[in-house]
From Swiss-Prot:
PANTHER family registered for this protein in UniProt: LARGE RIBOSOMAL SUBUNIT PROTEIN UL30M, MITOCHONDRIAL RIBOSOMAL PROTEIN L30
NCBIfam families in the record: rpmD_bact (TIGR01308)
Subunit organization: Part of the 50S ribosomal subunit.
Family, per entry: Belongs to the universal ribosomal protein uL30 family.
Name of the protein: Large ribosomal subunit protein uL30
Any one biological process term the GO annotation gives: translation
InterPro entries: Ribo_uL30_ferredoxin-like_sf (IPR036919), Ribosomal_uL30_bac-type (IPR005996), Ribosomal_uL30_ferredoxin-like (IPR016082)
Amino acid sequence: MATKTVRIEQIGSPIRREASQRATLIGLKLNKLHRVSELEDTPSVRGMIRKVAHLVRVLDDAAA
């Protein structure tokens, strides 16, 4: 059974953001603008995306 994944792209800079937001971007495997990361769709990843929603964009919501 294939696990669901979510693709996200960084669209905002972490400059002048709180350290926790910078750490969240690193946890999402993002570090530069317009980089795309594909992660397993879990509640913890969704929470991290919600925390930095102003800095990222979800590209594919449901990919199996």
